[in-house]
Amino acid sequence: MTIFERSKKGRKAFRLPESDIPEYSLPDRFLRRTPPELPEVSEPDLVRHYTNLARKNYSVDLGIYPLGSCTMKYNPKLNEKAANLEGFREIHPYQPVETVQGSLRLMYELKKMLCEITGMDDMTLQPAAGAHGELTGMLIVREYFKNRGDTGRKKVLVPDSAHGTNPASASMVGFEVVEIKSKNGMVDVEDLKKLLDEEVAAVMLTNPNTLGLFEKDILKIAEMTHECGALLYYDGANLNAIMGKVRPGDMGFDIVHLNLHKTFSTPHGMGGPGSGPVGVKKHLVDFLPFPQVKKNGELYELFVPEKTIGRVRSFFGNFPVLVKAYTYILTMGRDGLERVSEMAVLNANYLKKKIEKFLEIPYNGFCMHEFVASAEKVFRETGVRTLDIAKRILDFGVHPPTVYFPLIVPEALMIEPTETENKETLDKYAEILERVVKEAYENPDALKNAPHNTPVRRVNEVLASKKPVFRWRG
């Protein structure tokens, strides 16, 4: 039932006292012709409605959330407390810089810390999410070559295992996207060599990649990319695996985008809020979006980079997310962040070892923070697909992994347990998944009709995507 269906004419959740200020009528041209169709409910009905909706949701505060390539780690509540401090909560972006020195200092110091973590020379905090950061990075690439008069570079090379946003971001900026083939789950260096020429503007990579494998030829790839005059772009989706161990800048990357809402522990999902800072090496610093923050003596000021691509978002980005990420980094410290990556990799390898007993691991061996399993054999022998397995997992009160990604693995399950889950939780999750796979052979219909115990049963996802309903009534 929607909040509109609970509406009863005349019910109110809040009443204002009578006002002694004389009434003033607005001109007719500003008035609605009909009253807005807003729900009329009492406060108890309002609270109960949204409380019941919340109880139907799942979050990392309820249990493991192993979506691959999403880094759904537990988010310390201290971060929320910091972001809710009055000095951060009650400011306005139009205030004079003299009155928001604390906020500017936080942004300046956060940039410095992120540059140290990634090996970049400067950074913008404006982008609102990872894909937005990618778009910003591609705009910088385009402007860089335009400024050099090198207008013939129209191609961006992207691995076949890449996130879908990689080719989308490059395409939106006007580049032609060319796919690099994989070999043993990593970039095929020989295929890359054939594709690199004077028309290539950039190569976009994730390292570790979406299969959870570290690109062992990354230094060679960087050298080849730079020799042909192109830039190397780093998708920071999987940075959680390498903090304190290796830096993108030291691998040879020129541009990097991060996902503060993932790696640096701020709640995310359902479209936000996110933050996708973009870091660059020295030769690209002048192309960063404005405004940028700098320190002038004891004051923090805003400035416009000389060759800026312009604004990519209003004001200064999703500022509360910046506060949470800043708090997380200070709380963890350098050793703590390194420990985060160590535990993320350990947990992934432990869980992979449990799961490889009953599911295929196409690219086996040591993984980083995540791994990809395949239910192709299960589907071939039982007719049960990965989607059915994922739906059945819901009946056990936990969230399924990412499914059908990356596209180069048939019937894929992409699993990222993160560093914040303990051994008992990992054991329980493996036990649930094994039980579901066993059930596929013994009672396949139970999976094909799952979930059975959730408030909402299986929906027609194709219909939902093709004919979405955006209104509460037709």
Swiss-Prot record:
Cofactor needs: pyridoxal 5'-phosphate
InterPro entries: GcvPB, GDC-P_C, GDC-P_N, GDC_P, PyrdxlP-dep_Trfase, PyrdxlP-dep_Trfase_major, PyrdxlP-dep_Trfase_small
UniProt keyword list: Oxidoreductase, Pyridoxal phosphate
GO BP terms, alphabetized: glycine decarboxylation via glycine cleavage system
GO CC term (a single one): glycine cleavage complex
Protein EC: 1.4.4.2
Pfam families found in the cross-reference section: GcvP2_C, GDC-P
Catalytic activity of the protein: N(6)-[(R)-lipoyl]-L-lysyl-[glycine-cleavage complex H protein] + glycine + H(+) = N(6)-[(R)-S(8)-aminomethyldihydrolipoyl]-L-lysyl-[glycine-cleavage complex H protein] + CO2
Broad EC category: oxidoreductase
Modified residues (N6-(pyridoxal phosphate)lysine): 262
Top-level taxon of the source organism: Bacteria
GO molecular function: glycine binding; glycine dehydrogenase (decarboxylating) activity; pyridoxal phosphate binding
Subunit structure: The glycine cleavage system is composed of four proteins: P, T, L and H. In this organism, the P 'protein' is a heterodimer of two subunits.
Function: The glycine cleavage system catalyzes the degradation of glycine. The P protein binds the alpha-amino group of glycine through its pyridoxal phosphate cofactor; CO(2) is released and the remaining methylamine moiety is then transferred to the lipoamide cofactor of the H protein.
Stated family: Belongs to the GcvP family. C-terminal subunit subfamily.
Annotated protein name in UniProt: Probable glycine dehydrogenase (decarboxylating) subunit 2
Organism this protein belongs to: Thermotoga maritima (strain ATCC 43589 / DSM 3109 / JCM 10099 / NBRC 100826 / MSB8)
Lineage: Bacteria, Thermotogati, Thermotogota, Thermotogae, Thermotogales
Gene giving rise to this polypeptide: gcvPB
